[in-house]
Regions:
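Short hydrophobic alpha-helical segments enriched in small aliphatic residues
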Residues: 9-15, 19, 23
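Class II aminoacyl-tRNA synthetase catalytic cores and aaRS-like
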Residues: 2, 21-595
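Extreme N-terminal basic, low-complexity initiation segments
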Residues: 2-8
């Protein structure tokens, strides 16, 4: 065994030997039920740094975040001091936490902290800057999988790194399962004859499940044909202080939501969602670029909230002593781009709406909005259909996708269309038109038990009644067309139907996926709509838009006729996979445990 500058902590715990080649009788495999016999057992859930202590179990002290952080540092320093003074790993830890109390590190974390301290004492860096990683686990698999007979050896020396998922100790031989970030695994074998007794002993002493491990050695097949790397060298690439959950058990919902990084390690479905989301966004961008759309970025902080009917988040800018809103939509700025001569424009970015949270709504979400000069709500519907279908093909290889519950859903073929007023009239058995009074609509809503708004108008009542009959029943892709003018202040009046605007909502599997307009570009009519919205706001409607005089001035410069669309990226993933909105967002907002 030899170290590179062995007493300097800037170097890794890097073991190598020039011992003779292994013998074939050392080739054994890790079973499916591998255990780490030298280290602590795994737990059902990762250790939570925010400890919740029930009053009936332990009288936990009241402690601020800073106080607890200082407590944990003091415990870390105490463990390190004991190691420096010659204590063994077992002697350095306090399983019952008599000294530091119930909010201190549990025993498993203490043991890992002690191993970190032991590495530093011996001049080994538990977090080296770099290692001689020359190959990926995926590349080794791709090159050699299925091509070696049991017991075969190659002359291919590789340097790989991955997270330790399993360890099995067979005396003079250790088997380790290493996982790459995408979940691809490979077996590494560490033999006393190859790396030396001291190096193998150190491996057993220091390496835990969850550590990132570097291994350099020859590619072989074990006697049962398992593709393996037979180690000449090994090094800890990153020492994990928190234990992993038990990987063969499904993670509970709380762990998945609060600790998404654990979910990525333990659950292939979560890793796939992250990758599929990235593929979906790339596909959307590619389709827009094929149609000569230009991507822009518009302000997140806005002085006026507009572009959608939603309650905004508010904040304050100290430098200007100015109240601001987190944007609820980029629409008014993207339309300014049309005024400026960018005829095809899109943006993929975050929006914020201070509203309820459920399976299809989140306060922070990602939207794509696009505007096409000289288009309308028909041309933009065709574009959205193409966007969705191409995304399904680019992510899953077909317009027919398999949802998480195993059912199939087909985005191919022709998509249905229906009129909001005609379909509502059919459901009620009586004609509803833009001239139907608020009183009559309110009476119908009361008889049906439909919830009514504090500030209501004809358009809101029509939409609520329509949603009562249809919203969760439109399973196949369906464009619902021609909305009331009152709820669509930024949309152009229908070219042939008075009192109706050229707007559609796209419904998929019972929820709204996207919306599209023929965009209003008459500044006088737009001012009328803004004034009506402002009056609703004064009456208590928190979702009503403000009057944006700068936008009205921009319209006065001249905006070409246009079609526009908006679609939630999170909802697109819901449609493609059957997940909830939280499952599509890599780091969803969750209420803190101590709030």
């Amino acid at each position: 065994m030899g170290y590179s500058n062995p007493r300097h902590p800037a170097h890794a715990a890097h073991m190598r030997t020039d011992a003779a080649k292994h013998t074939k009788n050392e080739n054994e495999d890790m079973s499916e039920h591998n255990v780490n016999t030298e280290n602590e057992p795994t737990t059902d859930a990762p250790v939570d740094e925010t400890v919740v202590v029930k009053d009936e179990e332990v009288a936990a002290p009241s402690m601020s975040t800073v106080e607890r952080a200082e407590l944990l540092l003091k415990q870390d320093e105490t463990i390190a001091r004991r190691i420096d003074e010659g204590a063994t790993l077992d002697e350095a830890v306090d399983p019952s936490n008599k000294e530091f109390g119930p909010l201190a590190h549990p025993e498993q974390v203490q043991m890992r902290v002690a191993k970190r301290a032991m590495m530093l004492k011996d001049g080994l860096n538990p977090y080296p800057v770099s290692l001689d990683v020359t190959d990926t686990i995926e590349a080794v698999r791709a090159k050699w999988d299925g091509k070696l007979e049991p017991g075969a050896e190659t002359g291919d020396t590789v340097g790989i790194a991955g997270r330790v998922l399993f360890i099995r100790n067979a005396g003079g031989l250790c088997f380790v399962q290493l996982a790459a970030g995408d979940g691809t695994t490979i077996q590494a074998m560490l033999s006393k004859k190859q790396i030396g007794a001291d190096s193998l002993k150190l491996f057993k002493q220091l390496v835990d499940l969850g550590d990132h491990l570097f291994v350099k050695g020859r590619v072989i097949a074990s006697k049962t044909g398992e593709l393996s790397v037979f180690a000449d060298e090994w090094a800890i690439a990153s020492k994990a202080l928190q234990p992993l959950p038990t990987l063969h058990k499904e993670l509970n919902e709380d762990t998945r939501t609060r600790k998404p990084y654990i979910g990525m390690i333990a659950d292939e479905k979560i890793r796939n969602m992250v990758r599929n989301r990235s593929k979906a966004v790339s596909s959307l961008r590619h389709t827009f670029e094929e149609h000569d759309f230009l991507e822009v970025e518009t302000p997140m902080l806005q002085t006026i909230h507009g572009g959608a009917a939603a309650r905004p988040f508010t904040t304050h800018m100290n430098a200007f002593d100015l109240d601001l809103y987190l944007r609820i939509a980029p629409e008014l700025f993207l339309k300014r781009c049309l005024v400026g001569g960018i005829d095809r424009v899109f943006e993929i970015n975050r929006d914020f709406r201070n509203e309820g949270v459920d399976a299809t709504h989140a306060p922070e979400f990602t939207m794509v909005e696009a505007y096409e000069a000289y288009g309308n709500y028909d041309t933009i519907a065709a574009l959205v259909k193409e966007l969705v279908q191409k995304t399904a093909i680019d992510v899953f290889g077909s317009t027919k996708v398999t949802l998480l519950d195993g059912t199939e859903y087909d985005f191919g073929g022709e998509w249905k269309q229906m009129s909001m007023y005609d379909s509502l009239s059919e459901a009620l058995g009586k004609e509803i038109t833009p001239d139907t009074s608020v009183e009559e609509l309110g009476s119908i809503a009361d008889k049906l038990g439909v919830e009514r708004d504090d500030v209501e108008n004809h358009g809101k009542l029509v939409e609520h009644l329509w949603e009562h009959f249809y919203e969760d029943k439109l399973y196949e892709p369906t464009f619902v067309r021609d909305f009331p003018v009152e709820t669509s202040p930024l949309v152009k009046a229908h070219r042939s139907k008075p009192g109706v605007v050229e707007k559609w909502d796209l419904y998929v599997r019972g929820f709204e996926l996207a919306t599209g307009y023929s965009e209003l570009n008459d500044p006088i009519v737009q001012r009328e709509r803004f004034v009506a919205q402002a009056k609703d706001a004064l009456a208590g409607d928190e979702e009503a838009c403000d009057i944006d005089e700068d936008f009205l001035e921009a319209l006065g410069v001249g905006m070409p006729p246009a079609g526009g669309m908006g679609m939630g990226i999170d909802r697109l993933l819901i449609a493609l996979t059957g997940a909830t909105i939280r499952e599509t967002i890599t780091f969803p907002l969750v209420k803190p445990l101590n709030s």
